[in-house]
A protein has these predicted regions:
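Short basic helix-loop element that most often maps to the first helix and adjoining turn
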Residues: 14-31, 58
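Alpha-helix N-cap/N′ positions at the starts of helices
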Residues: 11-12, 36
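Ser/Thr-centric signal marking residues that sit
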Residues: 26, 40, 52
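N-terminal flexible/basic segments that precede or flank functional cores
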Residues: 1-11, 46, 61
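Short glycine/serine/threonine/alanine-rich loop segments
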Residues: 25, 36, 65
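Helix-turn-helix/winged-helix DNA-binding modules
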Residues: 22, 48-51
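Recognition helix of helix-turn-helix/homeodomain-like DNA-binding domains
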Residues: 35-49
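DNA major-groove recognition helix of helix-turn-helix/homeodomain DNA-binding modules
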Residues: 54-66
């Protein structure tokens, strides 16, 4: 059975930014906690598609979104 999954990437990124700020993490602090570089986190928050799925999941899991 084929499953179509649609992801609102922009909405997910905006929610991640909101959670980071609500938890009072700087980008640098969240990057360390998630195990990614600050430039990677910055790319994620800017919605750039060059980030790997693995790194996106690290960030989302750290924020409780995955």
């Amino acid at each position: 059975m084929e499953r179509n999954i649609r992801l609102d990437w922009e909405g997910l990124v905006q929610e991640a930014i909101k959670r980071r700020k609500d938890q009072k993490f700087t980008q640098e602090e969240l990057a360390v906690l998630a195990g990614v570089s600050k430039p990677t986190l910055n790319s994620f928050e800017q919605g750039k598609t060059t980030i790997t799925l693995a790194n996106a999941l690290k960030i989302l899991r750290t924020l409780g979104l995955a």
